[in-house]
Amino acid sequence: MITGIQITKAANDDLLNSFWLLDSEKGEARCIVAKSGFAEDEVVAVSKLGEIEYREIPMEVKPEVRVEGGQHLNVNVLRRETLEDAVKHPEKYPQLTIRVSGYAVRFNSLTPEQQRDVIARTFTESL
């Protein structure tokens, strides 16, 4: 369990009024802020703090954001010129199939606006 503390008495003056997170399971302390002697986010053994007195600090725990599944990537192995030519001459590309949002779609079945959107989003100069 992790407990937030403010050190109120210590043999080491650098620890006085410093804030720490104590991990009782690991026997470790993480420095949140101290006058000197300890770096922010430094992790030390609790025993390194020596004899101390402290008061517990209430902590607000925010829920973790969990992403299930991961990323999604559509790969279309085409040249920009091929799609632009398919817009101008759809009769030459009756079987041209692309991936849009995970679905296979015939390019010619898209509206002109959707075709322009696919070309704009598929071919970028930089991120």
UniProtKB/Swiss-Prot annotation:
Modified positions (Glycine radical) in chain numbering: G102
Q: Decide whether keyword Zinc is in the record.
A: no
Output the PROSITE patterns linked to this UniProt entry: GLY_RADICAL_1, GLY_RADICAL_2
Family annotation (SUPFAM superfamilies): PFL-like glycyl radical enzymes (SSF51998)
Keywords from the UniProt entry = Organic radical
Q: Which residue intervals define the domain Glycine radical in the entry?
A: 5-127
The cellular component terms of Gene Ontology attached to this UniProt record, alphabetical and capped at eight, are: cytosol
Give the GO molecular function terms.
formate C-acetyltransferase activity
UniProt function note = Acts as a radical domain for damaged PFL and possibly other radical proteins.
Query: Mind telling me what this protein is named?
Result: Autonomous glycyl radical cofactor
